[in-house]
């Protein structure tokens, strides 16, 4: 039997044990993390089904969020995965982007342990989405391989993130006046198709500077450099209302390398080649003609090929002006040769006419001498020189005559001269390099006639008697040889009337027109200097000019 003192002690021990057990259970409950409970709930598919069913219960996707109330704000941003190519002929560009849109739909708010509902594209068709379209897009494609490339997420507060992968071909108006030193601002415009700004507006998610991202590895273009992008927004009015339009400008600057190799350097080399013809002799007509025609055809081919990479614009570009000036230089080189050839022929014709008049004047000289006999020379010095030469001729003949019977030969030989009182130097005729020239023909006649009159007046040595010198004597032929023979030939060609025959007065050869024309000499300096000055002005103007198109800033 338990004593009365032990009963209270046992009851107290049970109470303490119960209190301790309760404290331990409470501590265990407090130490249990809420994440584990949330994880357990996430692992249950019934939670997702319950939340989605509750969201779509009574939801009408035909009505925008806040219908009849405040304006729906759609925030957008763009991530460019690939930019290009850019077509100058079609004036368009193509790019691949991730196009993101964010808005708040309070009808999709939910309570639960799940912070974000990550859903597939099947949910997109069951909720309201903005009717965004690209205003300047020519063709836009939403990728569907292997499934539609769409991302759809619903946050607990009703915020919705909708992302699509798109390939967009958009129009890029280009002003090609400065081609190929030009730059362009290619726009991408998008907005709501049906909702005016009184119901829906667009804004940039990260602000104007960071809402459009273009990585460097995504903008590797062949003919352009993507130097940056800017954003703006504008309001467009139409008969259905005013609409907000968001615009992104991609700034492109053209690369010059291709056009330098393909057009500019060949044009410069062709012009230089056309100017080489100025250093070719003007008589080389085939060579200079080939130079001119070949360079003109080459410039024509270059101008045609340069236009293939451009649209058929009605104005001239910077490259068109350069090609036109190069073509003008090449064509001018061909015209220059035509001018040289023309003036050379004119000069040769004038020289021929002067040459044809000279023999007529010479043939008229003997006729004047018959009417007006020549008087003795008035110049005493020339007369004395003539007499000395004739005296030397007589003395030489006399020395030879002492050993040879001159009398026998003189009866058989004809004398060189006829009796006359005219005095003209005979030795001048014999020493002349061309005794049959027009200038010496008249002097030859006078010299042949003047020999007998000169001999008697010439003082002689003692024991010698002056006498006529027969041309045909052997001693004379031995001593003077060819000179007297030329005199004899000239005298025999003279007729009884004293006129020169046509055969004794051969006309001088006509001028050949060889040498360098003055036009060529001027062209050798003028053409290169002018072309160099043109290139200097051309490149300084266009390389220092700001040719980048300006985008409109309407923020």
Curated annotation (Swiss-Prot):
The GABA-binding pockets are located at the interface between neighboring alpha and beta subunits. It is a multi-pass membrane protein. This is Gamma-aminobutyric acid receptor subunit alpha-4. The lineage of its organism: Eukaryota, Metazoa, Chordata, Craniata, Vertebrata. Keywords: Cell membrane, Chloride, Chloride channel, Disulfide bond, Glycoprotein, Ion channel, Ion transport, Ligand-gated ion channel, Membrane, Postsynaptic cell membrane, Receptor, Signal, Synapse, Transmembrane, Transmembrane helix, Transport. SUPFAM superfamilies: Neurotransmitter-gated ion-channel transmembrane pore, Nicotinic receptor ligand binding domain-like. The gene is GABRA4. Expressed in the brain. One of its GO terms (cellular component) is GABA-A receptor complex.
